[in-house]
Amino acid sequence: MTLFILTETSAGYALLKAKDKKLLKRDDLATEASTAEGVSNLLKLKSFQKFDSAATALEEVASLVEGKVTPRLASLLDEVKDEKKVSLAVADPKLGNAIGKLPGLSIELVADSSTTDVFRAIREHLPTLIPGLLPQDMSTMSLGLSHSLARHKLKFSPDKIDTMIVQAIGLLDDLDKELNNYAMRVKEWYGWHFPELAKILNDNIAYARLVLKMGMRTNWESSDLAEILPEEIEGAVKAAADRSMGTEISQEDLEHIQALAEQVVGFAEYRQQLAGYLTARMNAIAPNLTALVGDLVGARLIAHAGSLTNLSKSPASTLQILGAEKALFRALKTKHDTPKYGLIYHASLIGQATGKNKGKMARVLAAKASLGLRVDALAEWDDDATEEDKAALGTEARYNLERKLAAMEGKPLKPRGVAIAPNGAPQAQKFEINEARKYNADADAVTGDEPASAKKSKSKKLVEEVQDEEMADAADSDEESDSSDEETDKKSKKSKDSELEKLAEKAGLSLKRYKRKLERGEIQFDAEGNPSAVSKKDIKKAKKEAKKSAKGEEKKRKRTDDGEVDNSEKKKKKKKKGEE
């Protein structure tokens, strides 16, 4: 069987023919193929199909990585169709399966470990097998193709858009930490000069802006603080600056303090821009998740999972406790209760719930968020789809969850049957005018014209079958007897109930309790017939006493019986002695 070897290079496809049909079964293959002369003695070039450009090479190699047979490769394999009993060695088993499915191609494919030595020798001595191919050109083409293939993979990566959210939420957290550190440093530094300001003004950003605006506290008269502070706080700040107990500082100290305050104000402004950017990205990438849990919580969930695709693959139970891994494994190790929520705890819906309802809302919210995530990650939308259409599932689910939370908390429910705005708030539906019903004049009738029988029973049929008089009389008599029996039963029940009510009142019990105790045997009647309730303990004592008395009577009976037997035996003995 003739052996052909398919080799994919950065320059093109090479189809090599083995001079020895049993090449793959030889034991000395590795030693003979170690040199260029040995490889040229073992293999011969059948045909070579060169790539036209670098773009063509990238398309061909990308399709080979996915296990697809391109038209260029199929045309190369057509040269082997006419030959009989042919085997083809391929390096990739995935590509071998795709070649085996080509119509009209009867080739035995070999893609196992026996081909590794052959392909290693071909890669080392490829320029000797293909005439006109220089080693320098081969290395340059391989390097360019590898770079192009790497860019192609990054360009079409499904996780590429998630990196923006992951980096943005990480930077937002870092900015919050730095802002807190810098703001506290400004307060401590400027507090030596104006210590009363920290007690009056709690906002860090307003504090930094005031430091930039006023500078020395002695400039309080000439500085206009109306742009930064309201009138009440402005008056308190100026009054405190007038009688401050702080120390004096130099102009150089103030410059350094103001430089740090500028950093605080700049970080605060950039943080607002970054928060707006993150909100826009979350609404574009994961609109349903954002509608349910918010942009910050959703971004933290995506960052913790690594990507939107990974987060969408996780079930609702994992989503619920995502971020609480330490507490989860600690609880499993110590055999305590597992945590109910992780990062999802900071969602507004869970924050609105109280006490016991937080765990329920976390479970339900995680279930709805997992559904919304799968829509965000896997749904394919048309170009005409709006943001409201993409976030419809999450908005409707949030509205239903708010109704459920209100029902659990005992608050008034939101109205049903209303349209839902993009922000989740209910809004009025479109008002539609339906055509009025026409008045049917033929249905009118005068009430006085109806006969007496029609007035009494309007639901009778228009046509009825009339039975014989005897049958009618019998039926009437049966009905009368049945009705009379029912009336007597009702009267007897009423009389029994009234008697039971009287007895229950005498016993000092309700009717239900009296009936229950009567069934259990806990009601006793005196000589006059008045009922009285007896406790279970008294009944048990009475039963025990009855058992004791019964046992005593049995013993007495046995004694009397034994005495009678002894007397009869004595009499018999006396009679026998007299006869003797």
From Swiss-Prot:
Assigned keywords, A-Z: Nucleus, Ribonucleoprotein, Ribosome biogenesis, rRNA processing
Ranges for domain Nop: 285-410
A Pfam family matched in the record: NOP5NT
GO molecular function: snoRNA binding; snRNA binding
GO BP annotations listed: box C/D sno(s)RNA 3'-end processing; endonucleolytic cleavage in 5'-ETS of tricistronic rRNA transcript (SSU-rRNA, 5.8S rRNA, LSU-rRNA); endonucleolytic cleavage in ITS1 to separate SSU-rRNA from 5.8S rRNA and LSU-rRNA from tricistronic rRNA transcript (SSU-rRNA, 5.8S rRNA, LSU-rRNA); endonucleolytic cleavage to generate mature 5'-end of SSU-rRNA from (SSU-rRNA, 5.8S rRNA, LSU-rRNA); protein localization to nucleolus; snoRNA guided rRNA 2'-O-methylation
Record-linked Gene3D superfamilies: 1.10.287.4070, Nop domain (1.10.246.90)
Coiled coil: none
Subcellular location: Nucleus, Nucleolus
GO cellular component, one term: box C/D methylation guide snoRNP complex
Keyword Lipid biosynthesis: no
Residue segments, region Disordered: 444-580
Regions of compositional bias (Basic residues) in chain numbering: 570-580
Residue ranges, compositional bias (Basic and acidic residues): 495-505, 547-562
Extent of Acidic residues compositional bias: 465-487
Protein task: Required for pre-18S rRNA processing. May bind microtubules.
Family statement: Belongs to the NOP5/NOP56 family.
PANTHER family registered for this protein in UniProt: NUCLEOLAR PROTEIN 5 NUCLEOLAR PROTEIN NOP5 NOP58, NUCLEOLAR PROTEIN 58
Protein name per the record: Nucleolar protein 58
